Amino acid sequence: DPKPLKANAGKSFQGSIVLGMGFTFDDSGEADDDTPGIPSPIATMERLIAENPRNADVIFPYIGGKEVNDSPTHAHHRYVINFGDRSEEECRSGWPGLMAIVERKVKPGRMAQNREIRSRYWWRHGEICPALYSAVAADESALAVAQTSKYKAFTFLGKDFVYDQKLIVFPGGICSSFAVMQSTPHLEWAEFQGSSMKDDPVYTPSLCFDPYSFPTAFLDPKTTNPTHESALQSLEDIGKLYHEFRAELMVSNNEGLTS
């Protein structure tokens, strides 16, 4: 079996395992202010921010694979409370209104979790992924792909999202990265190496990304080798052209990546 390559370590991440839809604000389906396990209305979020602007510090746009694949502009429609790794005391004193929501709508489900750490820290996401968000913070955007989809289509997303667990995220999103990841060799490799869910292939980083042998120029973006510089620039130009054309086509046809 292919082995993970050191050059690829720490360059791909699964998004956050929020573990509780009660953390979210979403008007696209069932939502209310009381029922555990479902979102709150966005109007509730807006009211809480108006009452205490500091609440905006821990509410983030939330995006998953469906929005990335279905929206022509990868538009999100959800928001999520994210206290990071803050203590319960800090969250209660700093954001009492939001903590009340999480206690009412998330805690009951989390207390039933078999993993003790998830019930003990019920006000935090199930997996907060600090390495992912630290890596993304250094760049303007990140490359992402829906983990489970018949067609693998990579795209750029802003860095201010909370990424759902159904997204695989690659910090340092540049057009040369996009060109390599969207290329036929990589897509065929991922389909062959990856796992599956029902009839859809699953992009599993440990199987699809970590063992993949990327072009030398791609691995050394600060190269001073003229041949590698030329190859990297070609990848950058091709990736930019393809991504821009695809983005314009999706908007003009009002179609998503896989619709």
Per-range role (PLM):
Residues 1-259:
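S-adenosyl-L-methionine
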